[in-house]
Amino acid sequence: MNMDVNAVRSSIRGKHWFNVLTQNFEAIDTGIASLHVANGQLDGMEISVLSIVADEHNLYPRARQGEVGLLEGWSLAFAVDQIIQADRELEKKRSIVCIVDVPSQAYGRREEVFGIHQALAGAVDSYARARLAGHPLVSLLVGKSMSGAFLAHGYQANRILALNDQGVMVHAMGKESAARVTLRTVDELESLAANIPPMAYDIESYNSLGLLSNLLNVSNADEPTDEDIEYIQQALKNAFEDITLSGVNDLKHRLDAENRSMSKRVRELLREQWT
């Protein structure tokens, strides 16, 4: 069971950023209230924007605060696959933006029985296929990007951007859960994280792992100004241009950061042994 279930609070950041970045876009019916999709243009570039949002009336109680659950996983998989199929014959594929503000995957007995692992894997598969098919894929982290929810929605992107704000964090589990699992207090966990970047919750520590392409400074992450919106739109445009110029659709660049040197070395040694 997720020991953070009762601690999760609904965030509206993802929904708000989705709304301001998709003004005058065409809203796409996804069949569920917790997945928003819109198609439009960014400086003449065709893009699709996807975001998971809170739905207090979600059929599954464990997925009412913006978590990625059974419905969200399969709906993401279908929505992204629709994009792939629509552009299959086009030489230039449309770009995809994932707006990420997800507190967790949905934990519950029903989720386990009905196979949430398959639902989330379906979303991962569709995003990976889109990237490999040539769709430039950029994730914008505006809030929590936690656990399997982030793996299902956002992690497969060619480039990951994040707001440089204390409300943005990436981790495998919440602090309270991590403290219980490691038999520490939250204060002890934070002290440990100060010297071990993968254990930390702040976005700057995550950035040191080489997984982010850019940290973006905005004046107000909760209520972005017109200047903030223009700045983020330009950052997205720059990221898409960088993807196109690189001509690469894999994720190997994530291993180039200093704190990933041993990860890179392990892969090199395994490759030597297996070939």
Where does each model-flagged region fall?
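STAS-typified acidic loop motif
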Residues: 43-74
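Conserved catalytic cores of soluble enzyme domains
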Residues: 108-229
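Glycine-rich anion/phosphate-binding loops
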Residues: 29-33, 66-82
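Amphipathic alpha-helical segments at domain termini/boundaries
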Residues: 1-28, 179, 183-275
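A structural preference for short, pocket-lining loop segments at secondary-structure junctions
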Residues: 74-107
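N-terminal short beta-loop-beta anion/metal-coordinating cradle
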Residues: 28-46
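Short acidic, glycine/proline-rich loop/turn micro-motifs
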Residues: 59-63, 107-112
